[in-house]
């Protein structure tokens, strides 16, 4: 049947019927593209039947349900887990948190930088770490956050020093200057001469780092060609986090309680 999945099980061949290929296919909540994305990739599935003819039938939907059941029963907000990005949108990234179970990582929870689209930071297929933000056991939904794992202002600022020249990305323009991202969780302010555009990659000179007010003063030197993304630098990749403060006791900026 159209969109059945044929699996190489090593010692045999198995088949996942279309309606068992993903949770939500039967009632229309999940689009057919979710099945097509499985082609050529490893998938988790449960054996549901071996027919008298020897055909092995499997269900990816059942594996997804079991994984989500386990997550909703055993996990808690603040738990850190690995995930794989499956799709990027303007409102966030969809992630596989195990056996195809889906969770949403909202754009505002990706990092401190102001992003217009999750694709500005993540790519489908990318392996990441995230913390559980909330669990909706009634609607069976999981929401993630990543910014708390990418370091505080002080942790990120410690990677730079005044007098250094680095590459940054223009993330926003205001009446008083341009905010330029040095890392996903760290930005500095530079004067805007009117030629900068959001998304520009620029070479900047770090004039000063001011921990007391969480400010980094920059000077734009020149535009550069778009740079390949550096791997995300995580300061925590496991265990549990109960609370997180981005700034200091005087300038919290962002504060999370799980």
Predicted regions and their residues:
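Intrinsically disordered, low-complexity linker/loop segments enriched in Gly/Pro
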Residues: 15-16, 44, 49-76, 80-111
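OB-fold/S1-family RNA-binding modules
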Residues: 1-6, 30-32, 37-56, 82, ...
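Short, charged, solvent-exposed linker or helix-capping segments at domain edges/interfaces
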Residues: 70-71, 155-157, 218, 229-231
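A cross-kingdom feature marking solvent-exposed beta-strand/loop segments within repeated
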Residues: 13-37, 65-77, 102-124, 151-154, ...
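Surface-exposed interaction/gating patches
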Residues: 77-105, 113-114, 129, 134-136, ...
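A broad, structure-centric signal for solvent-exposed, well-ordered loop/edge residues
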Residues: 23, 65, 92, 112, ...
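Short, acidic/hydrophobic/Gly-rich beta-strand patch recurrent on exposed beta strands
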Residues: 6-10, 15-19, 57-61, 94-98, ...
């Amino acid at each position: 049947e159209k969109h059945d999945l044929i699996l190489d099980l090593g010692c045999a061949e198995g088949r996942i019927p279309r309606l068992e290929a993903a949770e939500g296919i039967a009632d229309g909540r999940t689009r057919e593209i979710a099945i097509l994305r499985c082609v050529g990739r490893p998938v988790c599935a449960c054996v549901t039947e071996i027919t008298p003819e020897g055909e092995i039938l499997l269900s990816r939907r059942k594996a997804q349900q079991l994984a989500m059941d386990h997550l909703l029963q055993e996990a808690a907000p603040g738990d850190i887990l690995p995930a794989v990005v499956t799709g990027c949108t303007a409102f966030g990234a969809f992630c596989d948190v195990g056996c195809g179970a889906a969770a949403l990582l909202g754009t505002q929870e990706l990092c401190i930088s102001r992003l217009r689209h999750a694709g500005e930071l993540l790519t489908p297929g990318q392996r990441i770490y995230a913390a559980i933000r909330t669990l909706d056991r009634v609607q069976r939904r999981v929401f993630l956050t990543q910014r708390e794992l990418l370091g505080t202002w002080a942790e990120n600022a410690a990677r730079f020093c005044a007098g250094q020249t680095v590459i940054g990305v223009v993330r926003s323009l205001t009446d008083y200057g341009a905010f330029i991202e040095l890392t996903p969780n760290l930005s500095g302010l530079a004067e805007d001469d009117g030629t900068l555009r959001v998304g520009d990659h620029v070479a900047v000179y770090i004039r000063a780092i001011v921990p007391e007010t969480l400010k980094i003063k920059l000077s734009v030197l020149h535009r550069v060609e778009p740079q390949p993304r550096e791997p995300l630098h995580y300061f925590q990749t496991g265990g549990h986090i109960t609370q997180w403060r981005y700034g200091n006791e005087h300038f919290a900026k962002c504060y999370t309680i799980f």
